[in-house]
Amino acid sequence: MTGGRSEYGAARVTEVEGRELMRKRPGMYVGSTGVYGLHQLVYEVASRSVNQILAGGGGCVDVTLTRDGGIRIADDGPGIPFEATGEARVGDSLETLLTRPETELRPGGRNTVRWSVYGVGPCAATVMSSRLTAEVRRGGVRRVQEYARGVALAPPAAAGPATDTGTTIAFWPDPDIFDTVECSFAVLAGRVREVALLNRGLTLSLTDERPAGGTRSVSFRYPDGAGDFVALLDAETERVLPEVIAFEWEDERMAGIAEVALSWRSAREERVRSFANSAPTPEGGTHEDGFRAGVAAALTEHALRRGLLKPDGPGLGADRVGEGLTAVVSVRLDCPEYDGSTRGRLGGATARDGVEQGVREHLGSWLDRHPERAAAVIGRITRDADPDER
């Protein structure tokens, strides 16, 4: 046996073993065999579509829950590459994407949107579905490939001309793996809207063909990104300011981009939502810490300059500025660091420093340009304090 054949045989064994392990231990790759894990399949496939769209500078991604229990995800991006590289065969890129974990053909770093917790890639849907069909429209040709439980039934085949570009992946989750194959329209709609809010200008839609009373559909596109997010969170509350404060900046020290939006309400509780590369960080992290420190510093410095605080009195610490605060803190990093395997908390000192300085500068500038509104915010924060502290 030649060395090449030996390497090919070893690769095939690894692929088969990986597929069998994913089917035998699905919770290791998508979290559970319940509806949570089912939704992870949708997120893994949708992530690839969104990242191709964002890399191409716009477009839309459509998610459809079909009448026969399938999920179809279509985009109008450039299409998964089919071109041969070196001695690779036509179709290798598609097959690699659909059969091997963590081999997504997408831009890396700060341009990557992460929908799911696990980051396995579309291969999770290939392996954990009874069948999957991939259609790619690229270079004027439409090609199709079908899979059954992770195994390709045939190589990608030309299926006629294509007048547009894009990729459509349809899959039917395997009932032998999942306790249920019924996706929740409400849960998916919430996550689809969240991703649209965090990526301004991106159009995402969700359609449900299953209801007996007729199809239901929602579509999301938000031109103001995080600013729209805060406005939505505060839609039914009384606000201190007539508008949302929002800004975005790039910081090479943290190797990424930060987007922040904030406002204050008459209510007392704090509502801060944070994200890293579009994935929620429910446990917070250094970006949240930097945000709070930056807000406190900007407000304290402005209040002292305007005589709204006594020089020898207490400053507006993070514990005080959070009262009634609604905010969205979103960072897009080349190399995000996380504390813990669930990626629920962002780590890294550079993220904290970058967000703190950026918020301090941008919010400070906004306060200086709007002194009356700044006074209203500071008054809101200090109104329950002892008069001698003001």
Show where each model-derived region lies:
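Bergerat-fold GHKL ATPase/HATPase_c domain
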Residues: M1-Y43, R106, I381
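Flexible helix-coil linker/hinge segments at domain or subdomain boundaries
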Residues: A349-E389
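Short, low-complexity, polybasic intrinsically disordered segments
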Residues: D76, P336-V355
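Flexible hinge/switch segments at interdomain interfaces of large molecular machines
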Residues: E15-R23, G160-T168, L262-S278
